[in-house]
């Protein structure tokens, strides 16, 4: 089924423009499709606080609680922004001109539910900031469907690019410290 939402169609149109210009050899371009990224910004004014993990870490610092606006059963592929930057740097500095197609999914290739990510944030708060924030789930759905998401990112290892899951934990700890320091209410 096709997604006709303006967000999706505008992104797909942009992808087509990049790939067409690449095919015409006007640019050397690739398309990165980003999964659910998170990480500390350079400035607190950065437009990043609507990212799920960033929002939850900010909540932990400001409110000392985590509030989900869903059941939390949704599966997502989470990746740290530092790993995204590293992958982009590899593409910029490497020779990937011979690739058949320039579409790459940037993700870890494994899923976690939103609720499990919130629980991980609770655990990392305890470890990093010595506080365990409460977790509130806004509502439960009648569905018990916990089918896993498989965000296909297998092209990266085939190019010799490997991701390290421990970097997600490091980034999460850094984000929690950033939020605690930046938003002034140390946990």
What is each model feature region?
Residues 10, 49, 149:
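Short, conserved glycine- and acidic-residue-centered signature motifs
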Residues 2-30, 35, 58-62:
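Active-site Tyr-X1-5-Lys
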Residues 60-64, 68-187:
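C-terminal substrate-binding subdomain of Rossmann-fold SDR/epimerase-dehydratase oxidoreductases
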Residues 18, 56, 155-157:
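Structural element of the ATP-grasp superfamily
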Residues 27-32, 40-43, 47-55, 60-65:
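Oxidoreductase cofactor-interface core, primarily capturing Rossmann-like NAD(P)-dependent enzymes
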Residues 15-19, 54, 89, 115:
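Short, hydrophobic alpha-helix immediately C-terminal to the catalytic nucleophile
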Residues 4, 35-49, 70-82, 110:
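Glycine-rich "substrate-gating" loop/helix at the edge of Rossmann-like oxidoreductase active sites
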């Amino acid at each position: 089924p096709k997604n006709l939402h303006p967000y999706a169609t505008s992104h797909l149109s942009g992808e087509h423009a990049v790939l067409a210009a690449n095919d015409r050899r006007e640019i050397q371009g690739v398309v990165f499709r980003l999964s659910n990224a998170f990480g500390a910004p350079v400035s607190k004014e950065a437009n990043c606080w609507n990212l799920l993990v960033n929002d939850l870490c900010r909540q932990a610092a400001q409110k000392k609680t985590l509030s989900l606006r869903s059941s939390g059963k949704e599966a997502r592929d989470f990746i740290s922004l530092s790993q995204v930057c590293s992958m982009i740097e590899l593409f910029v500095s490497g020779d990937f001109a011979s690739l058949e197609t320039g579409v790459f999914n940037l993700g870890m290739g494994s899923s976690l539910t939103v609720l499990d990510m919130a629980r991980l944030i609770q655990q990392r708060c305890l470890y990093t900031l010595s506080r365990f924030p409460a977790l509130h789930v806004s509502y439960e759905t009648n569905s018990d469907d916990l089918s896993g998401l498989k965000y296909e990112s297998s092209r990266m290892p085939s190019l010799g690019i490997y991701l390290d899951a421990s970097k997600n934990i490091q980034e999460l700890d850094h984000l929690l410290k950033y939020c605690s320091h930046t938003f002034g209410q140390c946990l």
